Amino acid sequence: MSVTEEDLCHHMKVVVRVRPENTKEKAAGFHKVVHVVDKHILVFDPKQEEVSFFHGKKTTNQNVIKKQNKDLKFVFDAVFDETSTQSEVFEHTTKPILRSFLNGYNCTVLAYGATGAGKTHTMLGSADEPGVMYLTMLHLYKCMDEIKEEKICSTAVSYLEVYNEQIRDLLVNSGPLAVREDTQKGVVVHGLTLHQPKSSEEILHLLDNGNKNRTQHPTDMNATSSRSHAVFQIYLRQQDKTASINQNVRIAKMSLIDLAGSERASTSGAKGTRFVEGTNINRSLLALGNVINALADSKRKNQHIPYRNSKLTRLLKDSLGGNCQTIMIAAVSPSSVFYDDTYNTLKYANRAKDIKSSLKSNVLNVNNHITQYVKICNEQKAEILLLKEKLKAYEEQKAFTNENDQAKLMISNPQEKEIERFQEILNCLFQNREEIRQEYLKLEMLLKENELKSFYQQQCHKQIEMMCSEDKVEKATGKRDHRLAMLKTRRSYLEKRREEELKQFDENTNWLHRVEKEMGLLSQNGHIPKELKKDLHCHHLHLQNKDLKAQIRHMMDLACLQEQQHRQTEAVLNALLPTLRKQYCTLKEAGLSNAAFESDFKEIEHLVERKKVVVWADQTAEQPKQNDLPGISVLMTFPQLGPVQPIPCCSSSGGTNLVKIPTEKRTRRKLMPSPLKGQHTLKSPPSQSVQLNDSLSKELQPIVYTPEDCRKAFQNPSTVTLMKPSSFTTSFQAISSNINSDNCLKMLCEVAIPHNRRKECGQEDLDSTFTICEDIKSSKCKLPEQESLPNDNKDILQRLDPSSFSTKHSMPVPSMVPSYMAMTTAAKRKRKLTSSTSNSSLTADVNSGFAKRVRQDNSSEKHLQENKPTMEHKRNICKINPSMVRKFGRNISKGNLR
């Protein structure tokens, strides 16, 4: 980005911008006095040819009163017409001189022109169209970021205005500031504050605050007329990062100036303060014009330049004719209302082209003190280490590149040709493979869509049957059958095509195996060459990428189909629910609502509220009638590409194949399996045996599964089965007897113990629990494995007296399913402890010395009268050996104590 002095233009660069006409000028019908010819030439007050004819002859009518057109041609460095944008002005004015600014040259951009010509709009702009100042700051910091690795850059800014020949700081509240001249620094404003922003956002914030403090008042010519000259200056200091005793520091200054417009009191209507402001503005602009005339007059040498006639010209001393590269933006109006102002602006701009500057880069050679030598040496050492690391990385990369080049040269020409041939074959194979796979996924999506549409047709027909009359149902049935037949035919066709695509895919896979085998023959060890192996892997990855993208597209299509059906269902529900509520309220007010209707309405309310139902861990709750709609996981699952089986002669197992993912039915997890699920079979290992621990054997443990009598209604209430763990037997202990005339329960006690608990049968053997279940036919159907158990010498089968299981208050078990509250009551009462034997008598020969606890079902007459099927469970404990004491966990529930 270095710029030499020979490359720079020593003349002031002048551009002209013509603003568009405003609504007021268009309404008045003023003619234009500025005509833009091209990007460099414009004509002021062009001639208008008026040709008149009288009786077919040309006549020249000379109007003596009419003023002759000047028809002046001006040539500038750039001319912007009415359609130009802020970015175009920035690209041709400020952006080119930023290179000079970064190389240490002072630069100035000033906007000159009459009031209302568009100077402030060009320099500052608006929120929608930022001006030159804003764009300059953004581009400057962008350039600084590009060179931050080579140079250390620091910036400082100041913002002032010249108002009524007084200088004020726009960034802080201060009084008038004095202008002084320094032999080294040049023109200096004493007391002007400098701010050091860290980013372009911060510097733009400072610029915005300064614009708010600037003096502006409306006049007859301009609603937002600037009453002062604004000067925004940026100081840039650059220093090389390379540590050295002699440091080269570049210091440059850029000035962005927005001048106030010249005006006439007769046209602007200025009075009082506005008149004084206009006078001072014209005075400073007149001094500026004189300076421009003096600098442009090359005939007179050593001529005095009147810089001190105004504060403005004193500030612009460096910018005009000094060590500065200056660009003037002359803003003019095309309307004839500003005829004189436009002419004067163009005249001064044309003279400013002749101003020459003496450009010199501001580079200072700073000699560091001897005390800084140690710091400089350390910085140089760190820089040397950094450069060595970069050089080492470069050499390693170069060596790796050389090895690859040598490896390529070592490959013989015939082998290269073979590799190229196989690469072409792989391209053709995978291109065909990709087409087959895409077609297969498309067919799979169409089949899923066909399945969904079939289900939606059936669902719609069911709704019509529930809602419409018989005639409409008959018509709908005909339409449904016709559509289902079409869908079925379509499905058969799609399935046939899918099978064909699968066959083609298998053929492609076989060809791929053959090609892999042939590629393995290229090397002596039977492995595929690295080049071909990489190509093969890339082809597989590309195929997987295409496959996943296609699956995503198909999923979106299916989701849209489901969303459409969901919206239709939602519309039906939104129409039905208010109608149902209205009918319910009407029937209730008329007294026509019965208990069944109330129950149905409450059930619908629960469904609408989405309330959850509490169930036991192993309880199989009555599920509503399932529809045939496949789950979302099934619909959104496509056959995936699995790895191809590796071939024997090739070590690489690249390739893909179609693998169908089996869909698993979602099941509810159980905390502990029920002992009635047939877990104690011979096929199950000992580690999977059912643990039949008593719920009260270890302090407080809740029942982890629902009692069978509460979970399911009995088929034969006169027979039950008792399951009990024993510590002395490893097989089943069956006890059966006939029922008596008082509907006593027939009980068959089958005792089983898991293998993993044979060594842990200490005190817990006393904590046994009987579980009532069905017997005879139902038990034979449920546990067929029990009949096939081997009866070895260790198995003991004992028949006990049925009178020992007779109960005092025995009654048939109700056949209906108990309510949730009944199940909860049964669970609570299961933990009750009754040590007396007055309620029930349990007599048995206990030769092994263990305790038994029997749960019985009792119900009171009061409950029978109220038709509430509640079941009481009482425990009866037989006489046990005094040395064996039963331990129970305490339950702090009040409902368990009587």
UniProtKB/Swiss-Prot annotation:
Residues 681-690 have a biased composition (Polar residues). The keyword Lipid metabolism does not apply. Residues 368-453 form a coiled coil. ATP binds at G113, A114, T115, G116, A117, G118, K119, T120. GO terms for molecular function: actin binding; ATP binding; ATP hydrolysis activity; microtubule binding; microtubule plus-end binding; plus-end-directed microtubule motor activity; tubulin-dependent ATPase activity. Glycosylated. Ubiquitinated. Induction: By estrogen. Residues 667-690, 830-871 are annotated as: Disordered. Residues 834-843 have a biased composition (Low complexity). There is a cross-link at K24, K683, K794, K868, K874 (Glycyl lysine isopeptide (Lys-Gly) (interchain with G-Cter in SUMO2)). Residues 854-871 have a biased composition (Basic and acidic residues). It is found in: Cell projection, Ruffle; Cytoplasm; Nucleus; Cytoplasm, Cytoskeleton, Microtubule organizing center, Centrosome. Pfam families: Kinesin (PF00225). Gene3D superfamilies: Kinesin motor domain (3.40.850.10). PROSITE patterns: KINESIN_MOTOR_1, KINESIN_MOTOR_2. GO terms for biological process: cellular response to estradiol stimulus; male meiotic nuclear division; microtubule depolymerization; microtubule-based movement; mitotic metaphase chromosome alignment; mitotic sister chromatid segregation; protein transport; regulation of microtubule cytoskeleton organization. Residues 11-355 form the Kinesin motor domain. The keyword Nucleotide-binding applies. Keywords: ATP-binding, Cell projection, Coiled coil, Cytoplasm, Cytoskeleton, Glycoprotein, Isopeptide bond, Microtubule, Motor protein, Nucleotide-binding, Nucleus, Phosphoprotein, Protein transport, Transport, Ubl conjugation. Belongs to the TRAFAC class myosin-kinesin ATPase superfamily. Kinesin family. Interacts with CENPE and ESR1. Microtubule-depolymerizing kinesin which plays a role in chromosome congression by reducing the amplitude of preanaphase oscillations and slowing poleward movement during anaphase, thus suppressing chromosome movements. May stabilize the CENPE-BUB1B complex at the kinetochores during early mitosis and maintains CENPE levels at kinetochores during chromosome congression. This is Kinesin-like protein KIF18A. It comes from Homo sapiens (Human). The lineage of its organism: Eukaryota, Metazoa, Chordata, Craniata, Vertebrata.
